[in-house]
Curated annotation (Swiss-Prot):
The gene is csgA. Belongs to the CsgA/CsgB family. The keyword Signal applies. This is Major curlin subunit. The keyword Membrane does not apply. GO terms for biological process: cell adhesion. It comes from Escherichia coli O157:H7. Residues 1-20 form the signal peptide. The lineage of its organism: Bacteria, Pseudomonadati, Pseudomonadota, Gammaproteobacteria, Enterobacterales. One of its GO terms (cellular component) is pilus. Keywords: Fimbrium, Signal. Curlin is the structural subunit of the curli. Curli are coiled surface structures that assemble preferentially at growth temperatures below 37 degrees Celsius. Curli can bind to fibronectin. It is found in: Fimbrium. Its main location: other. It comes from the Bacteria.
Length: 152
């Protein structure tokens, strides 16, 4: 299983135009770590899917005009740290389960979008966006959720 994870992460660490990367992870409480690495360049796509408790994801897209970054986490204890510097790009984060947290940053962009959806107790989101004509949507359903959003 360790070799499979390393191969999946290695396949996504390099970057360039019109590249797509996917890091699926399954397993309960195994402490999986999805390193999306730096998938940069225009028209890039980065997807991380995690199923099981104890997972974490770190994703960065820089100089990624017209690009998409998607993280989906199901299970307790998940966390995500996401960054994107781009125009006309999007971040879509979905977390289902207990104890999830997310930090999202989008900078130097215009016409960009961030969507955060959290379902379950104890979720938290911190969102910062430095972008013109851009949008942030945060949806939280459950107990003890909190959100902080800044747009500059």
């Amino acid at each position: 299983m360790k070799l499979l994870k390393v191969a999946a992460i290695a396949a996504i660490v390099f970057s360039g135009s019109a590249l797509a990367g996917v890091v699926p992870q399954y397993g309960g409480g195994g402490g999986n770590h999805g390193g999306g690495g730096n998938n940069s360049g225009p028209n890039s796509e980065l997807n991380i899917y995690q199923y099981g408790g104890g997972n974490s994801a770190l994703a960065l897209q820089a100089d990624a005009r017209n690009s998409d970054l998607t993280i989906t986490q199901h299970g307790g204890g998940n966390g995500a740290d996401v960054g994107q510097g781009s125009d006309d790009s999007s971040i879509d984060l979905t977390q289902r389960g207990f104890g999830n947290s997310a930090t999202l940053d989008q900078w130097n962009g215009k016409d960009s979008h961030m969507t955060v959806k959290q379902f379950g107790g104890g979720n938290g989101a911190a969102v910062d966006q430095t972008a013109s004509n851009s949008t942030v949507n945060v949806t939280q359903v459950g107990f003890g959720n909190n959100a902080t959003a800044h747009q500059y």
